[in-house]
């Protein structure tokens, strides 16, 4: 039994690609394969022309690939600022530059007011943003964001959207965005890749994906599409 089959996903610099699909479609499995936490039984993974299929996560990170996780991966006893600094220093950034980088990212993600608080005391939405800041602290060429909007109040999602756009527009990084917030995905993605039952169901610009009845059927079921319950 294979979690993924015949999936061909390309992520380019300065581009946001949304990755969507029903629960169990294989989204997190794909992220784990791309970042080295799982190893494929066939196929290959390339990072800017280099075959990294057998590289461990740390080596991929040093090569410019960063990610966030669905669940917290922060140092709860350290301050918010220290969490970002540690991530930067771990990527080889000198301590003084790491502190400046942390200040920049905390401001970008609206966390400056929490800079000296222990990470373990953050609300869920703030903890998500800290995960994004830690990923960006390494100055990655590509960043994979796994459910960054989960737990965020709806009023704070536009701020997150602007932060993700800045990763693309100001830092020139490629972004793979996985989230159940479909409005966020549709708003900021340049392309969307749809998985269903471990296979690529569709790929294209947001307008094409929104109008794709196969995508609607994967989420709502064939009966809903046949009854005309789907709005394009």
Residue ranges of model-derived segments:
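Glycine-rich phosphate-binding loops of nucleotide-dependent enzymes
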Residues: 1-232
């Amino acid at each position: 039994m294979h979690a993924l089959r015949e999936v061909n996903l390309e992520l380019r610099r300065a581009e946001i690609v949304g990755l969507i699909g029903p629960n169990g479609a294989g989204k997190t499995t794909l992220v784990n394969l791309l970042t080295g936490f799982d190893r494929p039984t066939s196929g290959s993974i390339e990072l800017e022309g280099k075959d990294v299929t057998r590289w461990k996560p740390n080596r991929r990170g040093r090569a410019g690939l960063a990610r966030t996780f669905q669940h917290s991966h922060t140092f709860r006893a350290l301050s918010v600022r220290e969490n970002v600094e540690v991530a930067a220093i771990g990527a080889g950034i000198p301590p003084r530059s790491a502190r400046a980088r942390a200040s920049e990212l905390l401001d970008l993600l609206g966390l400056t007011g929490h800079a000296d608080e222990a990470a373990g005391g953050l609300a869920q939405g703030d903890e998500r943003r800290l995960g994004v800041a830690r990923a960006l602290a390494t100055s990655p060429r590509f960043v994979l964001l796994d459910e960054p909007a989960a737990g965020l109040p709806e009023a704070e999602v536009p701020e997150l959207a602007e932060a993700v756009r800045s990763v693309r527009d100001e830092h020139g990084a490629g972004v793979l965005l996985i989230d159940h917030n479909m409005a966020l995905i549709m708003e900021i993605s340049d392309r969307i890749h749809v998985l269903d039952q471990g296979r690529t169901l569709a790929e294209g610009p947001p307008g094409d994906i929104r109008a794709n009845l196969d995508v609607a059927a994967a989420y709502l079921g064939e009966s809903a599409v046949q009854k005309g319950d789907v709005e394009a």
